[in-house]
Structure formats: C-alpha cells, structure tokens
Amino acid sequence: MARRILIGTTNPSKIVWLKSYLADLPGIETVTLTDLGVTAPVSEEGRTPEENARIKALSYHQATGLAVVGHDSGLYFQEFSMDDPRQPGLFIRRVNGQTLDDDGMLAYYSRLAQDFGPLHACYCSGFAAVDETGRVATFAQDSVSDKDYFSTFGFLMVGKPHRMRRPGWPLDSLSQNPKTGEYWYDQEGGRNTIEESDYSRNYRQNVNRFFTNFFQNK
C-alpha cells in the first residue's frame, strides 16, 4: 500500500510545484486537502516563511494524522525598507487588514508597480515536513540579504498585467525577467525561468534532498 503524503495547501499552482519535489520518492501517493475534504483554517503567526510552513504542516497533520509537506513564502521589494508598510513580506495576500483574492492581488500590486516600479522583487521560501508520528523538520535557504540568491531568483514586478493567468499565483502575470524584460509567460520554459547556475542547481537539489532524507528517515 502506498504511503500517503498530504500536500498542505489549497493553492492549485503550489500543489503541482510541491509535488515535483516528491517525484523521486518511491512508494508514495500524494493527496490534497480537497481530496480529504479538510477545511480547517490555519493561523499563520510565524515570523518567517519557515516558521509558517511548520505551523501549516503540523496543523494539517493534527487534523488528518497523515504525513504532510508545508510551504510558505514572503515577497520582498528592494525599493522598500523592511519596516515600510508597503513591503509585503509574509503578508502577500493580506493588505490593510483584508485578505485579497487573485483579482484583488493583481489590482493592488499592479497599482504599486505603476506608482513605484518596476519593482525589483524576490520570493523567499520555507519548507516543512511532518511524518505520521508527528516528527517535524524544516528547511530554508533563502535570504533577501543574500546577493547570490537575489540575483539568481529575483524578478521585476510591473504595472501592466500579462493576458495570461495562473490560479493561485496571480502575480506571475506582473512578473518579468530583469535581464530580458520578457514576461515570465512569454519565456521559453515559463514561470521564473532562470539561467542554470551552480547556485540554482544546488538550491533545487537541497530542497529535494531535504524532503527525500526526511521521508526516508535518513
């Protein structure tokens, strides 16, 4: 019988992305919150993406008893200081006390980019894994102060949306390659296509290794 691992998000684009990190694990079956009918809300009160990923993974494990993978991210603009209220940080969807849907995010961030952009942006991620016993581990390598990370994974956020949309990741429609000025959707390879480098290769390998080692109990 396959081991079931729950993807701890309802974001359809993030589900596909997180599944890709588990693709090399043998004998598993990934399931979603929708598959299980789980609607339990999660209070994201962590101070970092890594802490929020841990909170999510543990909450969904407690609700289901399953092994879980969790993820959270923050969005950061170089144009704003870390204490500037316009700096999204962990609150990408939460603006002025409201939680924005995809259309609301497009409207808000396109206005922000029109007023101050194009904005030099970067996502920073944290990952977490919980097994069936409740054992938990986290991983984060991203840092907005890491010049190699920002130069590798940074992008431009612009004020004019691309015609294409991706449910769950609406800001992809505002995102451009800073080296070519192309929208992500117009690049060969799609979302945030980057030049292959030792840094980017090692980053992906480290995330894969984190999940593989954890679920194989190494």
Predicted regions and their residues:
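Anionic-ligand binding patches
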Residues: 2-6, 13-218
